[in-house]
Amino acid sequence: MGLIRVWCRRYLQLPAYGLIPYDQRLVAFPAWAQQLEMESNGKSVDRQGHTLQLPAGPLIWGAVGTSAQHSFFQWLHQSVDITPIDILVAMKPPAGLDDQVWHDHHKLLAINAVAQAEALALGAPNMAEPHRHFQGNRPSVLISWDQTTPYALGRLLALSLIHI
């Protein structure tokens, strides 16, 4: 995740990067990444005070996927601006929850996450109604794991720290 953000910022010159977790328990993950990356890498000079020749890091933003789908996903799909995103999703609900309604809800969350990644990549052509046309070819990374556990969360945090 971290190295991809460096690539997108420095070499593709994309100024922002979105983090979209499809798990309410990860609601603070985008804010954590903002604090980590933007405070550390949001400077215009290096440690010796020399002006940087390349951008240091992107603007990091995001929200839980279910909220994001109804607010800014249309912009991600249809805007003239391109913003890469990471879509984060556990494929199974938390252990110990045997309620079928919970399992069905979580399955729909995972399906939505995969569908968003697919739509960003492939688009949804609709030339008859241009306001509904999705071009596709929008950069996104779908990061999935089995269940959200402390171990899985640690791995996710480690992926975010690779370039720091």
Question: What is each of the regions a protein language model found here?
Answer:
Residues 1-162:
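A SIS-like phosphosugar-recognition module
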